[in-house]
């Protein structure tokens, strides 16, 4: 019977994203090279999206760079962002939508479970909705599982939480 367990989650702290968006918008408004570019950053918390708008692609890339630097300073993982296409918009502007990924998708969770099973570690991994629970007999095995997963790239940001020992 496994006595120890931990959860693998992928979460983005929305208050930190909100603060980063506000800081980025303030910098965009103050930067000389973006003065008349009609650049805008809008956070839609209910949809987990950030909408970016600017006068052309070059200035949009500058806005993205500013936003990314503010997100990094606030410890928001950039792996949790999914960038949409750059779309021409009304008034000769361009838009881009960034989706904030919350939770682990089923395909990624299956990859994580498969990686743990292929490693021959004595742990049981189970998919629990939008997170993966890993259980094992001793803490050392769980630490090895965490090290193995940190060394692998699944294209998502993973946090290891809810570490339980008996």
Swiss-Prot record:
Family that this chain belongs to: Belongs to the YajQ family.
Species, as recorded: Solibacter usitatus (strain Ellin6076)
Residues spanning the signal sequence: none
Function recorded in the entry: Nucleotide-binding protein.
Entries under InterPro entries matching the protein: DUF520 (IPR007551), UPF0234-like_C (IPR035571), UPF0234_N (IPR035570), YajQ-like_sf (IPR036183)
SUPFAM superfamilies: YajQ-like
Domain of life: Bacteria
PANTHER family on file: UPF0234 PROTEIN YAJQ (PTHR30476:SF0)
Gene Ontology MF term list: nucleotide binding
Alphabetical UniProt keywords: Nucleotide-binding
Pfam families: DUF520
Keyword DNA-binding included in the entry's annotation: no
Record-given protein name: Nucleotide-binding protein Acid_3194
